[in-house]
UniProtKB/Swiss-Prot annotation:
<dbReference type="GO" id="GO:0006627">
    <property type="term" value="P:protein processing involved in protein targeting to mitochondrion"/>
</dbReference>
<dbReference type="InterPro" id="IPR045090">
    <property type="entry name" value="Pept_M3A_M3B"/>
</dbReference>
<feature type="binding site">
    <location>
        <position position="551"/>
    </location>
    <ligand>
        <name>Zn(2+)</name>
    </ligand>
</feature>
<dbReference type="GO" id="GO:0004222">
    <property type="term" value="F:metalloendopeptidase activity"/>
</dbReference>
<feature type="active site">
    <location>
        <position position="545"/>
    </location>
</feature>
<keyword id="KW-0809">Transit peptide</keyword>
<dbReference type="GO" id="GO:0046872">
    <property type="term" value="F:metal ion binding"/>
</dbReference>
<feature type="binding site">
    <location>
        <position position="548"/>
    </location>
    <ligand>
        <name>Zn(2+)</name>
    </ligand>
</feature>
<dbReference type="InterPro" id="IPR024077">
    <property type="entry name" value="Neurolysin/TOP_dom2"/>
</dbReference>
<comment type="function">
    <text>Cleaves proteins, imported into the mitochondrion, to their mature size. While most mitochondrial precursor proteins are processed to the mature form in one step by mitochondrial processing peptidase (MPP), the sequential cleavage by MIP of an octapeptide after initial processing by MPP is a required step for a subgroup of nuclear-encoded precursor proteins destined for the matrix or the inner membrane.</text>
</comment>
<protein>
    <recommendedName>
        <fullName>Mitochondrial intermediate peptidase</fullName>
        <ecNumber>3.4.24.59</ecNumber>
    </recommendedName>
</protein>
<dbReference type="InterPro" id="IPR001567">
    <property type="entry name" value="Pept_M3A_M3B_dom"/>
</dbReference>
<feature type="binding site">
    <location>
        <position position="544"/>
    </location>
    <ligand>
        <name>Zn(2+)</name>
    </ligand>
</feature>
<keyword id="KW-0645">Protease</keyword>
<comment type="similarity">
    <text>Belongs to the peptidase M3 family.</text>
</comment>
<dbReference type="GO" id="GO:0006518">
    <property type="term" value="P:peptide metabolic process"/>
</dbReference>
<keyword id="KW-0378">Hydrolase</keyword>
Length: 762
């Protein structure tokens, strides 16, 4: 059944489905193309009458398969056949590489990247399908194919023949660093990945490495699952002790009997209790109960930490942090610690003022004649009240009021992002046709990203609304990254079933693979036919993820292994965090915050007031993150191998020194620190990139955040390189501080001492 719609383009009214609308738009666009496509962009996200896509057959055209891959038009066998094809192509390239009598580093690196592209083009697609597809059978098929290729990838990571070929070629081409620096960088990355996998170890050590790595991965998954699924713990409290607490919260609690109430202490519910309960003694009990750990939980974490340290020792590193940071901007654990110490020192004076103000609030509320201690369990309660007092000063400017959400329809925000990127980089979003079978759900929208010469620079699939079975949170997926194409790589794409007739662009007489991105969010779709309206946190999420997308689209490199977001962990968040600074800037506000169906912008006073309220606790939040990053460094140092290591004692020492709460009691809060699994020794990265983003935003965009000149400088210094250039050189160029170009201890110290310059809402 075709969905009929009424769409107004200027003075013309068009009835039809999405495909008809797009076709008529193209005719109409000869007159007012840019204005028409800008309005249509907003409408395809906001007007539910428009058929976002048609999964059924249209005009006799058969389904093209997910992401226009013809293998995937067959849901039953397509995934495995695609995996098998990629495997066969990889093995053929490997055989050819090992037999080829060449030690030319550039040629060898190019073939390594070809292998990597064959694998990543398919396995990244499978990973996305596992996270997003609503059909459980399709997910199962994708998982089966993913496992098939993952096994091959693990085999290649420990392939001694490939390792020796690469190592020898880099040694035999000493001038490669100067003649082809990008090839040299890619080659070094491949070599480091091999050595991190223990391929260069002698046989018995290599076997131990494989075994210990497997054990560590198992322990890590167990710890992560425990940290994310901790059983709720309750306190039974008499109703009298809850006098003065939030009545809505108290009414929501289970009652043991008419005189006692059960209060949850773990996770989100525990945090709500700390926000809502007025009695400081009860808050302390909630905090302590919610941060208890069993002997088994502590031992699981300790075993996990020891296993990682033992893996590092097998490859000649004194700690897991030393192993992890080899290829990061920080380079060494001591540099991370010095950065965090300097940042903590920079934050200390304003932190003391905030804690003193909160202690004064506590004194007043408890009617004391002395300044009481301000404890860790007081933080949530008084921070919430302090923010509410700021909101109450100007209640008409509170953006949580429902009316203000109508300035943030999904279509308006995405239209605003397109307008922002047009100002900064000369890029714009244009709604694209969707062929039958190309997308996985009717909610999905597709846009092409065009430059000012009307060349397609990238493709973005937006999957923004929550649904059952979809992965939680927000995520940016690179389905295919950019890379320079030659005849062999073009043939590879065709062999893998990709429709590359529409996925190639030409620049300087070179052909490049067009990056394909998918953005996942979990916004709650509006009921009925109204547009979906976002709150400011949702808007922040879109801006953040679009920062990653722009990095993927503008990160043009010769080799896919270092394209876009394939860069150092402590550099990759910089482009996304800087987008949060754009969002918080009053000059950018009219681009993305306009009242439903109009061009009337949100009053700038609302944003300024919101920024002021949120930033009122920013130093507290920063100090908490510094403390967690310090614990992350502690847990990945060699101290965990000491037989006398006691995690709770060590964490208590770090907490008292770096949390802002010098008398914090021993507590096992770190058992809920799930990032110890995914961000081992690199949790500092988000803080580090926030500081870098603030410095770069202040340098380039403070005077005019819509400056094309500044946008071009950011693109040329930061975005275009992906991971093919030293990130320190990128930062040094953007900040015009050559002294930073070599990185190292002094550079980390300088960045930490600078602190956060620009302000972000979040």
């Amino acid at each position: 059944m075709q969905v009929r719609t009424l769409l107004t383009l200027g003075k013309k009214k068009v009835i039809g489905n999405r495909q008809c609308i797009l076709s008529l738009y193209r005719k109409y666009s000869n007159v007012q193309s840019r204005k028409a496509e800008d309005q249509l962009l907003r409408q395809i996200f906001d007007d539910q009458n428009i058929a976002v896509n048609q999964i059924t057959k249209r005009n006799g055209i058969q389904g093209v398969g997910l992401f226009r891959n013809h293998f995937l038009s067959d849901k039953d066998t397509g995934f495995l056949r695609l995996a098998e094809t990629a495997s066969e192509k990889c093995k053929a390239v490997i055989e050819d590489l090992l037999l080829e009598d060449t030690e030319d580093g550039s040629i060898v690196v190019s073939k390594f990247d070809r292998i990597s592209n064959l694998l990543c083009s398919v396995i990244d697609l499978f990973e996305f399908v596992r996270c997003a597809h609503p059909d459980k059978m399709v997910v199962m098929k994708a998982e089966e194919a993913y496992s098939y290729l993952f096994e091959l990838m693990n085999t290649l990571n420990t392939h001694q023949g490939l390792y020796e070929k690469l190592k020898c070629s880099l040694q035999q081409t000493p001038t490669l660093k100067d003649t082809d620096p990008e090839a040299y960088t890619v080659g070094r990355v491949f070599l480091q990945d091999f050595e991190k996998s223990g391929v260069n170890l002698e046989s018995s050590k290599r076997n131990s490495f494989v075994k210990k790595s497997s054990e560590s991965a198992t322990l890590g998954r167990a710890f992560f699952n425990n940290s994310m699924n901790r059983p709720q713990r309750y306190l039974t409290i008499s109703k009298q002790r809850l006098a003065g607490s939030d009545p809505y919260f108290v009414r929501s609690l289970s009652k043991n009997d008419k005189n006692f109430i059960m209060i949850p202490t773990v996770g989100y519910e525990g945090t709500q209790a700390l926000i809502s309960v007025a009695n400081p003694d009860v808050r302390k009990e909630i905090y302590m109960e919610g941060h208890k750990g069993t002997v088994e939980e502590v031992e699981l974490l300790n075993s996990y930490l020891r296993s990682k340290a033992e893996v590092a020792k097998l490859v000649g590193k004194s700690s897991f942090a030393d192993l992890q940071l080899i290829d990061k901007m920080a380079n060494a654990p001591k540099h991370v610690v010095e950065f965090l110490e300097n940042l903590s020192l920079k934050n200390s004076s304003v932190l003391k003022k905030i804690l003193n103000n909160l202690a004064l609030m506590k004194k007043k509320e408890l009617n004391l004649n002395f300044l009481p201690s301000f404890d860790v369990w007081d933080r949530e309660y008084y921070t919430a009240r302090y923010k509410q007092s700021l909101i109450n000063q100007k209640p008409s400017l509170n953006p949580s009021i429902t009316n203000y959400r109508r300035f943030f329809s999904v279509g308006t925000v995405i239209q605003g992002l397109s307008r922002l990127f047009s100002s900064l980089y000369g890029l714009r979003f244009v709604p694209a046709d969707i062929s039958p079978g190309e997308v996985w759900h009717p909610d999905v929208n597709k846009v092409n990203v065009y430059n000012e010469n009307d060349h397609v620079m990238g493709v973005i699939y937006f999957d923004l609304f929550a649904r059952t079975g979809k992965t939680d949170g927000a995520a940016h997926f690179t389905i295919r990254s950019s890379r320079e194409l030659d005849l062999t790589s073009f043939d590879d794409s065709i062999s893998l079933g990709f429709d590359d007739a529409t996925n190639i662009r030409v620049k300087d007489n070179k052909r490049y693979q067009i990056p394909v991105i998918s953005l996942l969010c979990n916004f709650v779709r509006s009921s009925g036919m109204d547009p979906t309206f976002l709150d400011l946190w949702d808007v922040k999420t879109l801006f953040h993820e679009m920062g990653h997308a722009m990095h993927s689209i503008l990160g043009h490199t010769k080799y896919q292994n270092l394209a876009g977001t394939r860069c150092a962990t402590d550099f990759v968040e910089l482009p996304s965090i800087i987008m949060e600074f754009f969002m918080s800037n009053p000059a950018v506000l009219p681009l993305y915050a306009r009242y439903e169906g109009t061009e009337i912008p949100l009053p700038v006073q609302v944003l300024n007031h919101h920024n002021m309220v949120e930033n009122s606790s920013a130093p507290l939040d920063l100090q908490s993150q510094i403390c967690m990053a310090m614990v992350d460094q502690l847990f990945h140092s060699k101290v965990v191998l000491d037989p006398s290591f006691n995690s709770i004692d060590e964490v208590t020492n770090v907490t008292r020194k770096f949390s802002g709460f010098e008398s914090a009691p021993p507590a096992a809060w770190y058992l809920q620190f799930s990032h110890l699994y995914g961000y081992s020794a690199t949790y500092y990265s988000y803080i580090f990139d926030t500081v870098l983003a603030s410095l770069i935003f202040s340098k380039l965009f403070a005077g005019n955040p819509l400056s094309r000149e500044a946008g071009e400088k950011f693109r040329k210094a930061i975005l275009r390189w992906g991971g093919s250039r030293s990130p320190w050189e990128c930062v040094a160029e953007a900040l015009e501080q050559p002294i930073l170009a070599t990185g190292g201890e002094e550079a980390m110290r300088r960045i930490g001492s600078e602190g956060i310059k620009a302000t972000s809402t979040f």
